[in-house]
Structures are given as C-alpha cells and as structure tokens.
Amino acid sequence: VKATKITFEEICNVWNVELWPERVSAIEPHSAMTWPFEGSPEQYDMNIFEYNPIFWGVYIDNKLVGVNSGHRTTDTQYRSRGIWVNQQYRKSGISQMLFNMTEHQAILEGCDMIWSIPRKSALPAYIKFGFETVGDYFDEGMEFGPNIYVKKRINVNS
C-alpha cells in the first residue's frame, strides 16, 4: 500500500468516472462552498480559491484505489472533499488513511476544524474517523445527494 500526494489531473480522472459520473457542474480543484454553521458566511466565497488544494491517492499494486482532496475554506477551517475508494477495497482502512493525510495537512496549515458534506452512503467512514453530523440530510444544491454536513475538531498543538 502506497499513500501519496497526486495531481489534480490524476484525481479528476477518478472523480469524473467513479465519484461524479455525468456531473453537470464543472469539476474544479476547489469548491467555493463555505461552512455555514459558524458566523454568517455567504454560501460561496471566491477567496477560497486563494488557498492551495492538495490531492491524495492510495495505490495497491500500482493501481489507484482511493483518493481524497482538501483545502482551507478560511484560515482555520479545512474542507475534506471528493473521497472515493474502489468498491473492491472498501472497509479495509483506505478511507481512514486518506482522512489521516487530510487531517495532517489541515494541522500543518494551522486549522482547528475539518468539515465535509458526505453522501449518506459514505457517512459511516466519516463517523469512524471522528466526524460528527451537523443538521439534517439535504438534496438542495447537491447533484449526488442526499448529503449531510459533518465536522471534526482537531488539536493543532498535538
């Protein structure tokens, strides 16, 4: 098993085919969506595009079997986005490995919280890693719902 940073082009191929097939909106390296539960941010913030996104992949026998990405959405909030694990390799710890890399990057960038908007079907992997749900499931504005907001507080000093 090899876990490593990958390029946007590499992750985009997986996202296009596996995670978001026939997606209507363009797949970009970032999302401008904000965490809506603290303060009163606009739903979208184009300043998010100032932050660098990072992309990770997990390889087994030189085959890309899992991906995730992350980027800050504020100076202290980090979004986990686009996790996918090949059906054959699910429930084998790959999502947890990807979340670990995401959390480590968030800590390196000085964030104290990670958030995401998983599909209902992916929620168990998030809960296992320590994410908590916020609010209820929703479909509005999501092409592959229902989705739910999740967050995890992280200790930057650990």
Which stretches of residues belong to each language-model region?
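A conserved beta-turn-beta hairpin within the catalytic core of GNAT-like acetyltransferases
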Residues: 72-83, 90, 142-144
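Active-site rim helix/loop that mediates acceptor-substrate recognition in acyltransferases
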Residues: 15-60
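Conserved beta-strand in the GNAT
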Residues: 57, 63-71, 79-84
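Conserved GNAT acetyl-CoA-binding A-motif
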Residues: 106-119
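Conserved acetyl-CoA-binding loop-helix of GNAT-fold acetyltransferases
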Residues: 85, 91-104
